[in-house]
Amino acid sequence: MPKINKYTDISEIDREAKKDYIDRHSPFITCANTATANEPFEVTVTMGNEYTHPDDFDHYIESITLFDGETKLAQATYIPGTLGNIKAHNTTKFTIIPTGKKLKLVAHGYCTKHGIWESTAVEVEVN
């Protein structure tokens, strides 16, 4: 089983290089706090908040996966050069249809050099 790296609040870290490493590999979820059952709901996942990630042929974000708890909802895959071979924030918009009473959204980003990185969970109330 591969190791899953988890986001650490970079404001609590002293070394700039470590802040950069953690932030640029971490997925960040942006969405509304509430959703309507059986209606489209948009979720944006951005790799990195303050720092950008490389897009080199051997070091890039290969995929971003969105989960509701342990249920895989969606996945986007990328090839090297998708972001023009420059450092950037890989941003993916997913549209899902919530059916339960609550969502517990978690995203995974996969870096070809540094493995799987997991976001902080985001809870969404479904009406």
Enumerate the language-model features and the residues they cover.
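Short, hydrophobic beta-strand segments
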Residues: 93-100
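Short amphipathic, basic-aromatic surface patches that mediate peripheral association
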Residues: 46-56
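Short acidic/polar inter-strand loop motif in beta-rich domains
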Residues: 110-120
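Extended low-complexity, serine/threonine- and proline-enriched intrinsically disordered segments
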Residues: 58-74
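Short, compositionally biased P/S/T/A/G/V-rich stretches that sit at domain boundaries
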Residues: 4-36
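Solvent-exposed serine/threonine-rich low-complexity stretches and specific carbohydrate-binding patches
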Residues: 73-84
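Extracellular Ig-like/FN3 beta-sandwich strand-entry sites
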Residues: 40, 100-106
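Aromatic sugar-binding surface patches on proteins
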Residues: 84-93
